[in-house]
């Protein structure tokens, strides 16, 4: 599976975990078997879970007149994934992480999601 597809699947898993009180393995079981064992997909999901408090703090310090809890689950999940890539995955250039996050926002969010995600990420990397 290519990284773009893995990001989409990781988003879906993390989104489910964010909106439902569900266990990780229960959500992972909903994926096809080959997807379940994709190394990049699992590294995104497990990385966001492991570093969630640090990632959320990073996001929170760059929000104006917002709290992380007020951000819609779609945008919050996408931001968490992008920040994980920027902070913890060295072989992905920042601009790739940002572009992929914007693409995810266009795919899964509304028409303003891409602008919001881009704005927050631009502040974080500045």
Curated annotation (Swiss-Prot):
Assigned keywords, A-Z: RNA-binding, Transcription, Transcription antitermination, Transcription regulation
Gene3D superfamilies: NusB-like
Coiled coil region boundaries: none
Biological-process GO terms, alphabetical: DNA-templated transcription termination; transcription antitermination
Superkingdom in the source lineage: Bacteria
Molecular functions (GO terms): RNA binding
Pfam families: NusB
A Gene Ontology term for the protein's cellular component: cytosol
Matches recorded under InterPro entries: NusB-like_sf (IPR035926), NusB_fam (IPR011605), NusB_RsmB_TIM44 (IPR006027)
Family: Belongs to the NusB family.
Chain's role: Involved in transcription antitermination. Required for transcription of ribosomal RNA (rRNA) genes. Binds specifically to the boxA antiterminator sequence of the ribosomal RNA (rrn) operons.
Entry protein name: Transcription antitermination protein NusB
Lineage: Bacteria, Bacillati, Bacillota, Bacilli, Bacillales
UniProt gene name: nusB
């Amino acid at each position: 599976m290519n990284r773009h597809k893995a990001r989409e699947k990781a988003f879906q898993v993390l989104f489910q975990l964010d909106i439902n009180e569900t266990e990780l393995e229960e959500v992972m079981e909903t994926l096809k078997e080959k997807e379940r064992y994709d190394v990049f997909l699992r590294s995104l999901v497990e990385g966001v879970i492991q570093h969630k408090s640090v990632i959320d703090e990073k996001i929170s310090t760059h929000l104006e007149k917002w709290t992380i809890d007020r951000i819609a689950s779609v945008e919050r999940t996408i931001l968490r994934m992008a920040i994980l890539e920027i902070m913890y995955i060295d072989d992905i250039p920042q601009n790739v992480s940002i572009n992929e996050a914007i693409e995810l926002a266009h795919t899964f969010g509304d028409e303003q999601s891409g602008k919001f995600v881009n704005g927050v990420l631009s502040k974080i990397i500045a």
